[in-house]
Amino acid sequence: MSIKISAIALFMLSFTVFVNGIPFFLTKGRIDTCKTLTGETIKIGESWHDPNSCSVYYCEVNSLGAMLIGKTCATVFYPSNCREEPGTGLYPDCCNKVVCGEEEMVVYPYEERSLRRYYFSKF
């Protein structure tokens, strides 16, 4: 009898440890909000601009729950006769601009967040 009770107690302890090991966003908090890097709470569909980097985050939901999806400036390779100038403001205005001679080009990501391609647009 004592062995059976010990086995049941061990099973219950193992189950409790397993359940508490599930990722935080699946077991705690709300599934309709996201927490930003600075601790603010935003709702699904809302965006948040990171004050410490040139990026924007969107609160989205998928099969795992609510999560932040981020966008930041593109890494740009340009000819030697061009240079980068810093941008100002919030994303995407804070992204560096590429200046080649008298022409200025701004690098924009495609609107579809799943694609990691970028295009150039004359300013």
From Swiss-Prot:
Identification of the protein by name: Venom peptide MmKTx1
Places the protein is found: Secreted
Keyword set, alphabetical order: Disulfide bond, Secreted, Signal, Toxin
Modification comment: Contains 4 disulfide bonds.
Signal peptide residues on this chain, from the entry's feature table: 1-21
Pfam family of the protein (one): SVWC
Broad class of where this protein is predominantly found: secreted
Residue ranges of the TM segments: none
GO MF assignments: toxin activity
Family (UniProt): Belongs to the scorpion La1-like peptide family.
SS bond partners: none
Tissues showing expression: Expressed by the venom gland.
Cellular compartments per GO CC: extracellular region
InterPro entries referenced in this protein's UniProt entry, alphabetically: SVWC_dom
